[in-house]
């Protein structure tokens, strides 16, 4: 459909030109538009036609069919664009070149695209509200031949020209308010009323998307769920093994006690990336639900990511798998329970390691009493750590090796490398989400009695050093409110380099090197100790005192901040009361972030401060259906000590935006209203669609769903129903990959019982292959540009 529209527009333009000069369409001059709003004064040269000039008031430039056009401001090359590229947008029927096209990337918020936009706007002294900008006044200041390939380069070029770079916050606002081909998008709902058992056993959609274009036309596109591959597929791996088969540090497949390979039923995060013109897909596998005998394997098996090389149909955009191979984690001590993830603005994959092992449970600490307590046995930390070490072949691995951010970089040709970063703290990280400066990120901490952290890297797209902060919730809404609202203040936990923290872990740092623990159990802590409560599935109350001195040359307080982030945050007075803090997302145009809370319970309820409840910052009504929160980002903020936070993207207000609603169980076992979200988990915001996508992980909906929340209208619609008991995972939206958009969506652990009524469960369970889980996407969308 998109190609037909595009072709029609181009043919119409050619026919009009041909009527005017009598020449053939192949040799007729065509007009394109350079758009970051409309950009005047940029020099261009087209080859092979030889056409040259400067862009006009509305960004116009001339070219012939088949030309590649190069754009410059002074001596600085912005990029070159093949005008035959089907991914280019349209402006009133004319092909439109955007900063992402000049940068050779597919995403408007990619760091390279932002760098090109920042340079253009700096040269034009642009304001976010400007609809036309002019670089001609400053073009002569850029006399040296150079290119724009990074944000750092923009700073260097601007300084040399005597200009101040436009802030990235303003760059994003201006860039995303600039003209695009798509004016608005609206999804229609998938109605599950009276849905057949057969359709409740699969990924099911009847939704459409109505796209309104800037030329006044509208098109409606039906959605369909497209399977890329299953976890158990054997046809695309080099050795014929299952796609998700688990391997040890030597690359050998790990077998269960029955001699059959461990194959997880839990595909999670996806990062669909364009690398040198080839699409690749990184996929997480979170945990092994069960082995071949049905024995629970959660957390006791090393986990995996795969890298799939894809091909894309040039006609309908359909993706297909060429090959699948494992990502090698042997150089970083293996991979522990990877949950959600994100594609970084610099086109790498940023993963997670959820439910990090409690280092106080480890035998090296020598705290047998604690190791035998429910804080350790409730999550089986000791059993999991020992099983992981044995199966992966990392006998001496420290608990502090896990709970990290693994970054996967894909090179041209498909080779992958992994770096685990120790600078973003150690927590039950659901997902790390970077903002427009490629330095600032927020992180959700999944579990009960958890916290919200902010990371600010020293340098853009470089995670080797940075500062970590934890949030304090200062409630504005009344006690017992539904969802609630609060101002956020930020407590600095510390600054560190990756090398510092990793060296201490390699040197054998233990929990007891960081903290003293008083176990006398009095109603109040003894002098010098602070009572804190933190946890995952099991909340732990501890009386802690930070040790003094250094370990491996690193101050103990710094190590505590980056090795025991949640404990240390609680010790410093941050709010450690959030409940199942899940996915996060970023809206660049509005400078907002979003965060999912599976439920508001336990620490988030209004409660009395007692010996077992040391804090009551969050005082909300209990809600088992959860909510999505909106966080307003601001520049010029200070931490709790009065020191400036070096970021223009600091969350300062947090309030409930989309809230679920509990109900009495219906005949199927649904315990949350079916027209509202239940237990939100995965989040992703599409800049061009202006839609926040919400994936569920709920026992309160028999069939979890993927929802589309239209942020401008507030309309919420279900666009995908998942198999009974399955969790919606792998959520990522790519607005434009070579002329097509994709909503990546997987599901895991289909057939789980949860709250499903027994009769309903018995009817549907037999229709589901519980060993199978799908990696796929919602297809049928045109490019959103």
Regions found by a protein language model. Give the residues of each.
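Bacterial Sec-dependent N-terminal signal peptides
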Residues: 2, 8-32, 59
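Generic hydrophobic, helix-prone segments enriched in Leu/Val/Ile
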Residues: 10-12, 113-134, 148, 305, ...
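Conserved small-residue
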Residues: 184-785
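Short amphipathic alpha-helical segments, especially helix-boundary/capping motifs
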Residues: 13, 126-155, 379-383, 406-407, ...
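Feature for extracytoplasmic/surface-facing segments of secreted or surface-associated proteins
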Residues: 24-186
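N-terminal hydrophobic or amphipathic segments with adjacent small-residue motifs
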Residues: 3-6, 12, 53, 328, ...
């Amino acid at each position: 459909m998109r190609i037909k529209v595009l072709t029609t527009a181009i043919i119409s333009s050619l026919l009009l030109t041909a009527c005017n000069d009598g020449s053939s369409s192949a040799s007729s001059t065509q007009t394109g538009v350079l758009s970051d709003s409309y950009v005047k004064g940029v020099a261009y040269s087209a080859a092979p036609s030889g056409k040259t000039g400067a862009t006009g008031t509305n960004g116009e430039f001339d070219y012939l069919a088949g030309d590649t056009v190069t754009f410059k401001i002074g001596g600085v090359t912005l990029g070159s664009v093949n005008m035959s590229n089907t991914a280019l947008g349209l402006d009133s029927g004319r092909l439109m070149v955007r900063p992402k096209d000049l940068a050779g990337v597919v995403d408007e918020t990619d760091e390279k695209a932002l760098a090109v936009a920042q340079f253009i706007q700096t040269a034009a002294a642009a304001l976010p509200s400007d609809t036309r900008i002019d670089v001609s006044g400053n073009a002569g200041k850029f006399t040296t031949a150079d290119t724009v390939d990074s944000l750092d380069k923009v700073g260097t070029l601007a300084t040399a020209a005597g200009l101040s770079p436009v802030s990235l916050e303003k760059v994003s606002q201006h860039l995303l308010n600039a003209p695009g081909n798509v004016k608005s998008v609206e999804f229609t709902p998938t109605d599950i009323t009276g849905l057949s058992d057969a359709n409740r056993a699969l990924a099911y959609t009847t939704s459409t998307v109505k796209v309104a274009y800037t030329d006044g036309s509208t098109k409606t596109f039906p959605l369909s769920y497209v399977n890329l591959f299953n976890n158990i597929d054997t046809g695309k791996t080099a050795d014929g093994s299952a796609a998700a088969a688990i391997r040890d540090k030597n690359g050998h497949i790990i077998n269960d006690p029955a001699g059959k390979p461990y194959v997880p039923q839990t595909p999670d995060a996806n990062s669909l990336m364009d690398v040198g013109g080839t699409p690749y897909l990184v996929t997480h596998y979170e945990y092994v639900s069960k082995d071949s005998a049905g024995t629970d394997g959660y957390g006791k098996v090393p986990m995996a990511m795969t890298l799939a090389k894809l091909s894309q149909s040039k006609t309908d955009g359909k993706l297909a798998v060429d090959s699948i191979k494992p990502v090698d984690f042997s150089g970083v001590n293996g991979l522990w329970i990877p949950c959600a993830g994100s594609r970084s603005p610099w086109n790498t994959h940023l993963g997670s390691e959820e439910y990090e092992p409690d280092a106080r449970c480890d035998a090296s600490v020598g705290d047998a009493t604690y190791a035998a307590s429910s804080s350790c046995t409730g999550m089986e930390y000791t059993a999991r750590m020992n099983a992981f070490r044995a199966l992966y072949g990392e006998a001496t691995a420290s608990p502090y090796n896990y709970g990290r951010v693994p970054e996967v970089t894909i090179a041209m040709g498909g080779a992958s490398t992994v770096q685990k970063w120790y600078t973003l703290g150690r927590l039950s990280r659901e997902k790390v989400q970077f903002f427009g400066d490629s330095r600032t990120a927020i992180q959700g901490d999944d579990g009960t009695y958890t916290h919200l952290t902010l990371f600010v890297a020293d340098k853009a797209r470089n995670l080797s050093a940075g500062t970590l902060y934890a949030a304090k919730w200062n409630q504005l809404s009344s006690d017992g409110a539904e969802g609630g609202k609060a101002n956020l203040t930020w407590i600095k936990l510390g600054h560190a380099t990756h090398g510092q923290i990793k060296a201490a872990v390699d040197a054998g740092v233990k929990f007891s090197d960081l903290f003293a623990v008083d176990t006398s159990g009095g109603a109040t802590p003894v002098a010098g100790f602070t009572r804190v409560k933190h946890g995952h599935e099991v909340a732990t109350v501890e009386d802690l005192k930070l040790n003094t001195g250094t370990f491996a040359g690193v101050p103990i307080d710094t190590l505590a901040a980056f090795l025991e982030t949640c404990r240390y945050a609680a010790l410093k007075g941050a709010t450690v009361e959030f409940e199942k803090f899940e996915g996060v997302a970023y809206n660049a145009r509005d400078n907002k972030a979003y965060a999912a809370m599976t439920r508001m319970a336990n620490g988030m309820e209004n409660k009395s401060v007692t010996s077992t409840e040391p804090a009551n910052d969050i005082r909300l009504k209990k809600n088992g259906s959860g909510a999505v929160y909106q966080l307003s980002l601001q520049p010029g903020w200070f931490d709790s000590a009065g020191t400036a936070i070096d970021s223009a993207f600091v969350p300062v207000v947090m309030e409930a935006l989309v809230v679920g609603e509990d109900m009495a169980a219906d005949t199927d076992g649904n315990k949350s209203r079916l027209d509202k979200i239940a237990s939100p988990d995965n989040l992703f915001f599409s800049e061009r669609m202006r839609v926040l996508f919400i994936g569920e992980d709920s026992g309160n909906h028999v069939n979890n769903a993927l929802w589309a929340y239209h942020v401008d209208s507030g309309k919420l619609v279900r666009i995908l129903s998942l198999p009974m008991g399955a969790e919606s995972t792998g959520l990522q939206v790519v607005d434009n990959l070579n002329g097509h958009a994709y909503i990546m969506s997987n599901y895991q652990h289909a057939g789980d019982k949860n709250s499903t009524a027994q009769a309903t469960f018995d009817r549907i369970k037999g229709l589901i292959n519980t060993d199978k889980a799908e990696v796929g996407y919602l297809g049928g969308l045109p490019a959103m540009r």
